Amino acid sequence: MKKLAKMISIATLGACAFSAHALDGKLVPNEGVLVSVGQDVDSVNDYSSAMSTTPAGVTNYVGIVNLDGLASNADAGAGRNNVVELANLYPTSALIVGVSMNGQIQNVAQGQYNANIDTLIQTLGELDRPVYLRWAYEVDGPWNGHNTEDLKQSFRNVYQRIRELGYGDNISMIWQVASYCPTAPGQLSSWWPGDDVVDWVGLSYFAPQDCNWDRVNEAAQWARSHNKPLFINESSPQRYQLADRTYSSDPAKGTNRQSKTEQQIWSEWFAPYFQFMEDNKDILKGFTYINADWDSQWRWAAPYNEGYWGDSRVQVLPYIKQQWQDTLENPKFINHSSDLFAKLGYVADGGDNGGDNGGDNGGDNGGDNGGDNGGTEPPENCQDDFNFNYVSDQEIEVYHVDKGWSAGWNYVCLNDYCLPGNKSNGAFRKTFNAVLGQDYKLTFKVEDRYGQGQQILDRNITFTTQVCN
């Protein structure tokens, strides 16, 4: 069935509710559709500022070979990626992360990058929020250079490793197809790694009209037939220049651009987009809209060596902006809220970690220090509020005493490997693997709205057997 044949008005769409349906996956909302925005740090920030909103979900990317974009800036011409920074900026938003194989899918499947996979999983898992992992995103996209067997093996490996490391409740795995019109139909089964290792089916939605919505419909039906929730992981009105109010039917170079009114742009791309969601309301549980000036990013800019994309920023046209806001006000869409994580089926682990650390540190360290030191002042090296405790010859606890910061988020870092700290005994703490006697750089980052917005503190130490706090 062609989706345009069932077009209804936005007013009618707004009156319909997305029905509850028991789907087989992780971090799936019982009711509603998660609204997320991408896909680079600065575009997300611009959207949040222009729309005066905190996105319920934010999207970014990591390369598996060098973990570029995980905890440092990486820009391959498509906007800046820095997952940890994005997590810092939006500590109460869900995180959607695309992982590129960098053309190395065979080596990934054979285990060459297992250490990087562990670092990725641990970093994401410790962010204490729902994380949706788009492993080898657009699995069947010919530009990615994947092969079916290594793709499936790597998917199974990562799914299992997430559970071995204890993050099965934190990280949900998305199998995302490209929904690319030139792709032949009937190929999805060859890329499918198995119902037991897929939490969500994802798709891309750019110019589905080029093939009469056949590829996105095929992906949706695949999700339905496997009882999996559906996530539109990449979507943007490709070839529309919203700022200029133009459209080109030329996907390669964007030639012969036609002028469009704001109303035409909405009715041609946005209305069918939301209609697709309505038509698949039994399985559709999340979408990411890429709100970016593609033309300003050199990878997508003239001479358009990777095709013509345009400008998809909804805030640049008053009518589009208002329609977008009005549509997302419908309660079927899951926007940012204080109970967002609960709606997504996520239970924060801060209480558990805080309880464990608080109990161990408060009981063991408090008792040991009080008894051993006989009530005297702690050793001189323990006077610094930013310090460490010996846990074992292979483990160090890094901590910073709470100075009354607002602390909506905080990160404790060892040699620039940063994880959210757990507050206990009046300090923010995190335990890391380390080697006794080695030198390390400690970093502490914390939100400080009462001061200058944030505080970042560094110090260098030698790991000894000291126990301070």
Swiss-Prot record:
Triggers of expression: By beta-1,3-xylan.
Keywords in alphabetical order: Carbohydrate metabolism, Cellulose degradation, Disulfide bond, Glycosidase, Hydrolase, Polysaccharide degradation, Signal, Xylan degradation
Residue ranges of domain GH26 in the record: 23-293
Gene3D superfamilies referenced in this protein's UniProt entry, alphabetically: Beta-1,3-xylanase, CBM31 domain, Glycosidases
Active site feature: E138, E234
EC class: hydrolase
Temperature dependence: Optimum temperature is 40 degrees Celsius. Stable below 40 degrees Celsius. Loses 70% and 99% of activity respectively when incubated for 10 minutes at 50 and 60 degrees Celsius.
Renumbered residue ranges of the record's region Carbohydrate binding module (CBM): 377-469
Catalytic activity reported: Random hydrolysis of (1->3)-beta-D-glycosidic linkages in (1->3)-beta-D-xylans
A single GO molecular function term of this UniProt record: mannan endo-1,4-beta-mannosidase activity
Residues of the signal peptide: 1-22
GO biological process, one term: cellulose catabolic process
EC nos: 3.2.1.32
Keyword Repeat applies: no
Spans annotated as Disordered: 352-380
UniProt xrefs under PROSITE patterns: GH26
Activity at various pH: Optimum pH is 7.0-7.5. Stable from pH 5.0-11.0. Retains 65% and 70% of activity respectively when incubated at pH 4.0 and 12.0 for 24 hours.
Biased composition (Gly residues): 352-374
Cystine bridges: C382-C468, C413-C418
Function: Catalyzes the hydrolysis of beta-1,3-xylan into oligosaccharides, mainly xylotriose and xylobiose with smaller amounts of xylotetraose, xylose, xylopentaose and xylohexaose. Does not hydrolyze xylobiose, p-nitrophenyl-beta-xyloside, beta-1,4-xylan, carboxymethylcellulose, curdlan, glucomannan or beta-1,4-mannan.
Notes on the domains: The carbohydrate binding module (CBM) binds to insoluble beta-1,3-xylan, but not to insoluble beta-1,4-xylan, beta-1,4-glucan, beta-1,4-mannan, curdlan, chitin, or soluble polysaccharides.
Family per similarity comment: Belongs to the glycosyl hydrolase 26 family.
Protein name per UniProt: Beta-1,3-xylanase
